[in-house]
């Protein structure tokens, strides 16, 4: 596995669509992704990454498998794009889930 930037760094460099480039490094913009799929998906827009997340058949008729990461599969089925608001929302969800886990395990008061 590698760390995938769902909203790619290259897109930010070219379009400057995030109000703050530091948001690229938030947990909400990252996911684990199989190395081969991450290489294929690289710097594409989210809408173009969907085929790599879900799997596809190339021009030679070879089937290229998709990811086994359930969250990316759900996102690729339900979202058309992944933008700044998605990064922020997902970041808050991840942090809140982690804090809740720590509390459930009595690791945080």
Residue ranges and their predicted role:
Residues 1-109:
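Flexible coil/loop and intrinsically disordered segments
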